[in-house]
Amino acid sequence: MARVTTQFTGIIMYRQDYRERDLLVKMLTDKIGPAMFFVKNAKKRGFRMTADILPFTHGTYIGSLDENGLSFINTASDTSQYKKIASDISKNAYVTYILALVDSAFNDGRSIGGWFKQVAAALDLIEKGLDEQIITNVIETQLLVAFGVAPVWDRCVVCGRNDLALDFSEQYGGMLCQNHWSLDEHRLYLDRKTAYYLQQFATINLQKLNSIRINPATKRRLQQVLDTLYDNEVGLNLKAKRFIKQMNKWEQNIGKLSMND
């Protein structure tokens, strides 16, 4: 597709300096997925779209979209920033990671189908106060397919049964029912609750989610499973993920200090 001026919906992912007065702004769009935009004079005092291109801003834009090169923004309307995400270190970290995952999973300039609405819904829910780790875990679970990993969550990969206890096997690429656990002594040894939530995460439409509460122990196990899959099967080493791990260590250390006091 040649460059064409059109209206589109976008989410500002990040931006970086370019020359003295200009910016490169990475945006997730509903038309061509992730795309890099050149914004001339964006650092100049009095620039009219300053608020429209702040990180974690979303809204309607008009510009020239290019599938194979830099795109351009002409104007913006009905934009607003996710203020709680922008100001809260934990929400900020998880949303930064979500956007980095999406940026890694999909090529620039290509439509990502329903993923735009799913990511937008994730950010809306985090902004509203739903657990940012759990919302991120849903995105992580569903994005595995985009990275070429397609775990079978809903049934035993050997016999197809789903009425028995299930556990995940990296070797077999999915769940094993208890009749076949002996096939993989290195399976993940999931408890029923963790297995259940992973099955739900794989298919849930975040646009229809209103609330979700999961106890801390199960949250830790869910994260351990997804970290294992991303480390071993996907092989990503994102800066945003490293920051989240470091942030969680800070929280654990603060908790220990509070207990000692």
Swiss-Prot record:
This is DNA repair protein RecO. Involved in DNA repair and RecF pathway recombination. Keywords: DNA damage, DNA recombination, DNA repair. It comes from the Bacteria. GO terms for cellular component: bacterial nucleoid. PANTHER family: DNA REPAIR PROTEIN RECO (PTHR33991:SF1). Belongs to the RecO family. The gene is recO. GO terms for biological process: DNA recombination; double-strand break repair. It comes from Limosilactobacillus reuteri (strain DSM 20016) (Lactobacillus reuteri).
